[in-house]
C-alpha cells in the first residue's frame, strides 16, 4: 500500500511539470525578467500614529542593544530583522508621520497663539494704575513747588523709580487724632472771622456771592506783602432758614437752594483767610459796612469782641417772623404790607437816632453789633435782641426810642431798656489761670466741640506732678555752703532754768526721798 501511494503522489508532479514548460530544467530564463522578482519590498506597513503625550521613539542605545543581544542569543536572525524593521529609523520619520495624520476640526472660537484674557486684563489694569501714579506725582510736585518758599526741590526718587513721600501723613480717625486735630482747629480759628446779617442772596445768586467775596477782600491791599499772600481761602454759610423745616438734611436743602426768606432774609457765615493778620484786621475794616443792602457784622472767632453791658440795650416786642402773611382760621386777612426785617431795621433805626457822638468809624454809625436771639433749628426769632454801641452815651439816646414804631422794618412798638449784666459761672481751676488759658475759656466748646472742651478742662485741672517731673534743689552760693538752716535738738543750752519740775526734784532729794511741799 505504501509503494502504491508513493507512486500515486509522484505521478501528478510529473504531469504538472509537463503541463508547465517554464518549470522544467531545460527551459531558458530571461535574466531581465528574473531580476524583477529577486528583490521584494516586503509586506505593506500600516503607519502608526503615536499619542500626543508620548515622546517619539528614538534609536536603541548601545547598552540596550548589548542586553538584547545577550538575552536573545538563540533567536533566529529573521526575528531580529523583523524587530528592527518595526522600529522607526529616526525621530524625523516619526514627526513626519504625526504631521501626515490630519487633526479633527475644533469647535472652539479661534484665538491668536498664546492669547490669555486674564493676563491681558491684568496688564491693562497695571498700566492704568501706573498712569494714575504718574499723574498724582506730577500734581504733588507742582503743588509743592508753588507752596515752598525756600525753593526746596522734590525728594530724590528711589532705586525703583518711584518717589516716596516720607512726610505724608497717615490718615487717622478723628477720635484717634485727638490733640492734633485740636491744634489744627485752633490755628484755623485764628484765621476765621464771623459774618452776621449776611443777605441770603449770596447763597442763591452767584453774582451776589462774588460781590460779597470782593467786599471781604477789599482791605487786603493795605496789608504788607512781606507777611504772605493775603486772600480768602473759603467761606461757609451757617444758621440759614430752610423751607424744608428740618425734614431733609441741611446740606440737601442748601444744594437745592430752598431758602425760607419769610422767616428771615439774613444768615450767618464764616470766612477763612490765608493769614492770621488778615483775620485780625477784618473786624476793624469791615464791621458796620453795607454790602448787598445790609449792614455787615464782622468779628474775630479766636478773639471775639468784648460784650459790655454798659454799652448795650435790650430791645423787646420784636416780630418772630419777618413776613407774617399767614392767618389762622376765622381771622380776617390782613392788608398786604411790606415784610419786616428785624436785624437790618435795628441797625438802621439806632444808627439814625444816635447822632450825638460819632465815636464809631467814620460813615458807619454808632452801632457796633446787633444780636437777634433765634431758635437754633428753625431760625424763628424769640422776640428780643441786644444792640451794642461804640460809646456809652449812645445808650441814653437809645432809651428815648421806647414805645415807638418804625415801619416797615419794625412795625411793632419797641421795648428798649438797659441791658443787665449776666453772671457767668466761674471755671474751676487749681491756680490762677494763665493768659493762654483765658483765651480758651468760654470758647473751647464753640471752636472744638464738647469732647475737645472736656479734654482741655481736664488738662487744666492737672497738677504739676501729674504733667511733668519736678526737680527740687538749692541755689548755688559763692562759698559753697548751704543757706538752709537745719534746727537740731539741744538738750542743755535751751533747757528751761527755774522750772517747776526742777524745784520738785530738789525738794525730794532734800527730804531724803520723801515727798515734801515745794516752796514757793
Swiss-Prot record:
Region (Disordered): 1-29, 41-185, 472-520
Its job: Involved in pre-25S rRNA processing.
Entry similarity comment: Belongs to the RRM RBM34 family.
Main location: nucleus
GO biological process terms, semicolon-separated: maturation of LSU-rRNA from tricistronic rRNA transcript (SSU-rRNA, 5.8S rRNA, LSU-rRNA)
Residues in RRM domain copies: 191-303, 311-421
Lineage: superkingdom: Eukaryota
Keywords: Nucleus, Repeat, Ribosome biogenesis, RNA-binding, rRNA processing
Protein's name in the database: Nucleolar protein 12
Subcellular location: Nucleus, Nucleolus
SMART domains reported for this sequence: RRM (SM00360)
Biased segments, Basic residues type: 484-520
GO CC entries: nucleolus
Transmembrane segments: none
Comp. bias (Basic and acidic residues): 120-132
InterPro entries referenced in this protein's UniProt entry, alphabetically: Nucleotide-bd_a/b_plait_sf (IPR012677), RBD_domain_sf (IPR035979), RRM_dom (IPR000504)
Acidic residues bias locations: 78-95, 144-168
Species in which this protein is naturally found: Emericella nidulans (strain FGSC A4 / ATCC 38163 / CBS 112.46 / NRRL 194 / M139) (Aspergillus nidulans)
GO molecular function: RNA binding
